[in-house]
Amino acid sequence: MNRKVGPVLEYSRRFSRVLCALRDEIRDPLQYGYQRVNTAEGSLSTSTTATSLDTIVLDTNAEDLASVPPRTLQHHQPQRTFSPILETDDTNPFLEPVEKAKSKSSLKSSRVSFDQEDDRFDEDENSFRKQREHFQKHKSHSTSEHKSQLIKELRHLLATDNRRQFQGKKHVSLDVKSAKVLEQLLKASSSSDDFEGQRKEFQERKHKSLDARHISFKFDKEPSPSSSDEDFEPSTSLLRIDADITKPVIIDLKDLDSSDEEDYISSRKHFQQSKSMSTDSRKSIRFLEMEMGTKEENMRTAVPFVRQITEEGKPKLEVYRPTTNPIYIWTQVLAALSVSLGSMVVGFSSAYTSPALVSMKDRNITSFEVTDQSGSWVGGIMPLAGLAGGILGGPMIEYLGRKNTILATATPFIISWLLIGCATHVAMVLVGRALSGLCVGIASLSLPVYLGETVQPEVRGTLGLLPTAFGNIGILLCFVAGKYLDWSGLAFLGAALPIPFLLLMFLIPETPRWYVSRNREDRARKALQWLRGRKADVEPELKGISKSHQDAERHASSSAMLDLLNKANLKPLLISLGLMFFQQLSGINAVIFYTVQIFQSAGSTIDEKLCTIIVGVVNFIATFIATVLIDRLGRKILLYISDVAMIITLMTLGTFFYMKNNGDDVSEIGWLPLAAFVVFVVGFSLGFGPIPWLMMGEILPGKIRGSAASVATAFNWSCTFVVTKTFADITASIGNHGAFWMFGSICIVGLLFVIVYVPETQGKSLEDIERKMMGRVRRMSSVANIKPLSFNM
């Protein structure tokens, strides 16, 4: 009975204490909280590790607490060290007070010192110690077995790394000793295929000794389980070199020590010297120097093949090759020659009025009357129609293509010359000249665009000047034929010139960039393959063209005119317009159109028709000189030379005519006009004649190239019309000397324009030029032209 009543009394006592505590807390919560804090501070253990209130520690006996009534317990609360608050459902027994020393000895590493003895802690501690000792023993046994394997793997990695470093350094040391063999092979080879075969056979023999599969590793010495990295001492040389250098190199891993650097370096040098001495006559490398304008870059065309083992176990070859294709010149020359024949027709048309007007005004030859006013229109209507042709040509090259636009001018050229040759009235001559001028405007726009998009940057300057050179051939042909033919026969000769041009245009492809703009990449690839050669890898260039087109599409607007007025596009357009302006305002077309009349007014002692022929020959020769120099000196240097030469000669001509008009005797210097004209034409043909047309196809962005070239061409022919139509009026008002001084002053301004605004485009791809002009350029060094190509054998 007492056993059953005891727990009930115990629970009732606990419940009464809880109620008392709650009552005190409700009456004065703040005071009760302070009391609890004070009692807690007093009850903390004096142990150095007891620093928190996480554990409740009792210093009194539970029996004493049980014998005290609840109210007495309340009054004596501050004298107690601490009184725990027990929940009603707490079934835990009261903790018996224990000695603090026992708690400290068993929980020295604990953060809080418990004043309670618990055998389970000692048991857990003993169990933990036993398990830890067992684990350490097990670990020592297991790691001793794996340690040897780990050391073996580490040494294997070290040997592999040292071998690869050694091979790489060995190849570098042998590079400079390898030029003679390939030269001998090249001289002894009958063809490029023969040379390639001998070179590959030589390289295969050469690299047998370098193949990673010929290197064996020896693991015959196993380290003891208790050994460490410090126990290994090198006893022999790192490398054992056989007498036959082509035999595999044995790297003995049992003798390998990463700290033995001196022994390794000595062995490597000895091996390198022996290898290079024994294979001096067989090792080869050839460096070809490729000249790109004024930049000379050494391009690697053959290097040692350093074999490395890939994860699949196959040897990996890494070679360095130029990223640009070798220049396959013949197809590009054919393309440039085909379109340049059209430029010859343009030159013939431009020079026609100079010899033809003299015979056309002769009533003994001509059945209709040609007045001075109608004669000026015969000379001036062609550039005016060229203005319309330039405007019309822009949409044509975008929708019909570059090639088809050029091809479309051949038949109208023939019709225009037949109209002039069969003319019975001056109106027929004017209609023929207008139709001819329309074709001239379209052709002068599309020819540089076609060549700029098909020719490689390395030869774009030279081949890009072929249209100008053939244009000067047309001028020379017109001057020479004009000495023997009248205006009608000269027109029939002009009708025959477009025939070879028409036939050759069927042989060349459309430009790859136009195909890409029309999403016809297969046709673009075929056209690029035709231009670069059958063996050329055209994929990188095709990807560059596609990327440039995509960039242009992202930055394009819905309106073509808005594209032209875009700030990024406006800069190259204004540069092109400026070059066209200073080209025509130099007075070149006034000189070409009225060469005979100028020499007649100068009173030169030399026959005026012979003078025109001399000027035409010099013009032709100077243009071919420019084709040689343009990729060596660059565009801007030739523009400087051209402008300075024109300034000097125009001022000299102005001074000569000024002296003549003032009545001074100039008979002793009658040769001066011809000499000045020759130097003027040479200067113009070197720079300001061909380069504005060439740079129009280079600096204009691809997205607006058609419309912008149309505007530039129309502007050029507008300036031509103004100069040729008003030249007679200008000379009548201010004299010949005033006209030439005016042209010379404009050339001075043109020189400043070139210095400040015109960029250099020599040796740059159209994509690089466009990124620079659009402000999206990323400068690359010449090393960017060489990149590693990896492939498996």
UniProtKB/Swiss-Prot annotation:
Q: Where is the composition biased (Acidic residues)?
A: 115-125
A biological process (GO) annotation for this entry? trehalose transport
Q: Would I find Hydrolase among this entry's keywords? A: no
Glycan attachment positions: N364
**Chain positions covered by the region annotation Disordered:** 99-148, 213-235
GO terms (molecular function) for this protein are:
sugar transmembrane transporter activity; transmembrane transporter activity; trehalose transmembrane transporter activity
Regions that span the bilayer: 327-347, 377-397, 412-432, 435-455, 461-481, 489-509, 573-593, 610-630, 637-657, 669-689, 704-724, 738-758
Q: Which residues lie on this side of the membrane: Extracellular?
A: 348-376, 433-434, 482-488, 594-609, 658-668, 725-737
Subcellular location as annotated? Cell membrane
Could you list which ranges are Cytoplasmic topological domains? 1-326, 398-411, 456-460, 510-572, 631-636, 690-703, 759-793
This protein's UniProt keywords:
Cell membrane, Glycoprotein, Membrane, Sugar transport, Transmembrane, Transmembrane helix, Transport
NCBIfam families this protein is in? SP
- Family the UniProt entry places it in: Belongs to the major facilitator superfamily. Sugar transporter (TC 2.A.1.1) family. Trehalose transporter subfamily.
Q: What does this protein do?
A: High-capacity facilitative transporter for trehalose. Does not transport maltose, sucrose or lactose. Mediates the bidirectional transfer of trehalose. Responsible for the transport of trehalose synthesized in the fat body and the incorporation of trehalose into other tissues that require a carbon source, thereby regulating trehalose levels in the hemolymph.
| PANTHER family assigned | FACILITATED TREHALOSE TRANSPORTER TRET1-1-RELATED (PTHR48021:SF96), PTHR48021
* Name of this protein: Facilitated trehalose transporter Tret1
Q: Which gene encodes it?
A: Tret1
